[in-house]
Amino acid sequence: MQSPSRAFLLILDGWGFGPKHASDAIYQANTPYFDSLMAQYPHSTLVTYGEEVGLPEGQMGNSEVGHLNIGAGRVVWQELARINKAVRERELHANATLLAALDHAKQHNKTVHLIGLVSDGGVHSHINHLKALCDIAVERGCPRTYIQAFTDGRDCDPKSGAGFLADLLQHIENKPVALASVIGRYYAMDRDKRWERVKLAYDLLVNGQGETVTDPVAALQKSYAENVTDEFLKPIRVQSRAGDQAPITTIQPDDVVICFNFRTDRCREITQVLTQLDMAEQGMHTLPLYYVTMTRYDHSFKNIHVLFEKDDVTMTLGEIIEKAGKTQVRIAETEKYPHVTFFFSGGREDAFQGERRLMVPSPKVATYDLQPEMSAYGIRDAILADIEANQPDFICLNFANTDMVGHTGVFSAAM
């Protein structure tokens, strides 16, 4: 039997087989075409969590992990597992890049800022990694260490941030470490070039602009009462005592900044505006900083110190297609464009020979429940035109709707 000359990998991001009850949006939805495919053709399911995708046992998966493993065609051990091991076995305590940064702060009497997502979601970061960094900074004798916290509410309960902050504050009690600011990931971890969102985070971190509080946990509880959950938490600056006119600290020139998110996509923009990209029209200017990231966010970034370099993932599907002399196209809307390109190619930024990349802009709405179709129709039109014009041998296409709309928690929109 002659094998087909072309292949189409269509990824319904966030679509899965659930418990089949009232809370299962996909099961409750009307999906006649998908149902017909299941009825007519052989099919199977994939395990998307835990050790089967290179994560710690029981740890839920995510889009980055899924695309990386599919593109590699094998289990790729993830940064969460690697860093957990480094913390557990005190390898992080001996990390030369980290120690050099902390020693720089000590020798030059500079402040250390730990910035990143404070939760145990394990998708972008983990609170245990932050706790370890706090401990190491204390052990190394750093004069001042401050936490600039981003709240989650997306990869964990929408109102769990208050508990995480309380846990963190207990951990750093009686240590020369303090919580300086808090802001929701919606602003600090944008990845869609919504610079107006990023500016709120920048202004908090650099200019100290935000609501002034002395009790951050109470401030989060107040926010919940106003129906503003962790993801969308407005900027908060934390003061050590009532009546202070200035925040505890802001990021100053020549300070040491350690961004402890290990996933690469959602701290690129805040790193850009702090260190790489002067955006005068937005009122954001880069600062001369000793800047450290947990992993390498972007190979084009200059003067960034990296704690954990990624494993070199070779012989991915894209590379094999290139070696076979075939053509391929990767297509998604903005939200998932890095997943069908960078992640699917094993962390490779550049396109392979014979590879075309098509990005359809995501809609400019506050949350995707307001436009649950997102840019699916634009993707459809773009790929049909490309097939007609170029006849690619392989297509990798991502529809982001189920994942991105599902994250809003609005059941009717997801269904």
PLM regions with names:
Residues 2-8, 15-186, 196, 200, ...:
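Active-site nucleophile/metal-coordination loop of metallo-enzymes that catalyze phosphate/sulfate
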Residues 4-7, 383-403:
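Active-site regions of oxyanion-processing enzymes, predominantly non-cytosolic
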Residues 9-11, 113-115, 258-259, 394-398:
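Structural motif
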Residues 84-92, 362-373, 406-415:
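Glycine-rich tight-turn/loop motif centered on a GG-T
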Residues 96-97, 392-415:
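Active-site His/acidic residue clusters
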Residues 156-159, 163-252, 258, 265, ...:
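Long, well-ordered, tryptophan-enriched scaffold segments
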Residues 261-262, 293-295, 332, 344-346, ...:
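Active-site proximal loops enriched in glycine and acidic residues that flank catalytic Cys/His/Asp
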Residues 327-386, 415:
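Metal-dependent catalytic core segments for phosphate chemistry
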